[in-house]
Amino acid sequence: MKMKKMVAGLSTAVFAFSALAACGGGTDNESTTDNNASSDNKPEKIVIWEDIEKSETTKEVAKKFEEENGVKVEVVEVQMTDQKDKLALDGPAGKGPDIILVPHDQIGTIADQGHLAPLSDESVLDTFTDAAKSAVMFDGQAYGYPKSVETPVLMFNKDLVSEAPKTMDELYKLSNDVKADGQYGFLALWDNFYFAHGVIAGFGGYVFKEDGGALDPSDIGLNNEGAVEGFEYIGKWYQEGLFPKGLVGESGGQAMDQLFTEKKAHTVMNGPWAVAGYTDAGVNLGAAPMPTLPNGEPIKTFMGVKTYALSAYTENQEWAEKFLQELTNEENALAMFEAYNEIPPVSALESNETITSNEVAKAVFDQATNAIPMPNIPEMGQVWEPMAQALQLVATGKQDAQKSADDAVKVIEQQIQANNQ
């Protein structure tokens, strides 16, 4: 396996909402799409796997596409988390789709396994944000059309907090001020690396070193001086009793949500996927970008991008790409946002009133400028568990930050080496 893979760089990132959602695309793709597919190779139909309960807009675009081009588009609902494994079985058997939907951080693994085809023309991605474009790059090639983005933001109860704090020092003071009343000023799942990454990166840590747009999995920065400082900062919130003891492990998310919906927590760090549950529970919800760290740096959250990718087994790539250019253009991306609150990484929509008037969507767009696409190279799979274990040791006070970070990196390096043999 190559030691350097093309991947999303640090780039202004994310516009998050509901754990994954949105859609992106071009504003005017007619001239491009007309050249991409010819009538000589027109198929009877193409098949796209869409996420469950989020296919109505796709079906509407498919109907219009068939009317205009004479190519039927069959839209099949398949749970997004199941599509990767299902393609591995159905694709080689000739029963798979032309297009699948996957989280961008799975692109490297699926492409390495031979199940994805790169785009024939990367220039069609120019209408997407830089962060979204970088997220779908792997090994020097583009592997999909960004549909939607997500990243954690600061959510607050407007009945308890009139205005979102701008700094973590403000949140630290608030947390201490309300502690005696059994309240929590701020809660976050910082024993989970997905959320903790923002702090660690903000202090100077990094997962894999970026080199000319490529990530080098042989250079891991999760135990450098900045990363250890991030570990120590995270541990401080637990050790000073500003986070409850139950905010560790698998039940941490449930505990945090309960405290927030019961008005015992003033603010939380969470993503768009949490919005429906909070509002249904009656929370007067506000949202803002994450506050800056004590060092003055932003919290550099992870960004995720739902991506429409092409099956390596398709015989209709030209027409599949033509459909995706239509599905992810500005008009249809906005329609998906209005239907499903999925935030589209389309540059032209950043100032669209429909999106800017939505407080959570705007917070995600703003946070995006400091977000980092999750590495999509296969080696990232070896990072999550060792980092979770290290963070939990720090959170529970069982081990200091330096040793926890060193041990985690050692395990990650060993696992990557073992998988590359």
Enumerate the language-model features and the residues they cover.
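Extracytoplasmic "Venus flytrap"/periplasmic binding protein-like
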Residues: K64-D130, M137, Y143, K158-S162, ...
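Extracytoplasmic/periplasmic substrate-recognition and gating elements
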Residues: K63-E68, K72, G140, T279-Y340
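Hinge/lid segment of periplasmic solute-binding proteins
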Residues: H104-V153, E163-L174, A180-G182, G226, ...
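Conserved N-terminal structural module of periplasmic/extracytoplasmic solute-binding proteins
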Residues: K2-A13, F17, A21-I107, P272, ...
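Periplasmic solute-binding protein
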Residues: G108-H115, A131-Y172, W190-L215, M303-L310, ...
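A structural signal for short loop-to-beta-strand junctions that line the ligand-binding cleft
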Residues: D90, P97-D98, L125-D159, Y184-A188, ...
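Long, aromatic- and glycine/proline-rich binding clefts that accommodate carbohydrate-like moieties
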Residues: A135-V136, A288, F337-P386, L393, ...
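Glycine-centered hinge/linker elements that transmit conformational signals in sensory
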Residues: S175, P217-L247
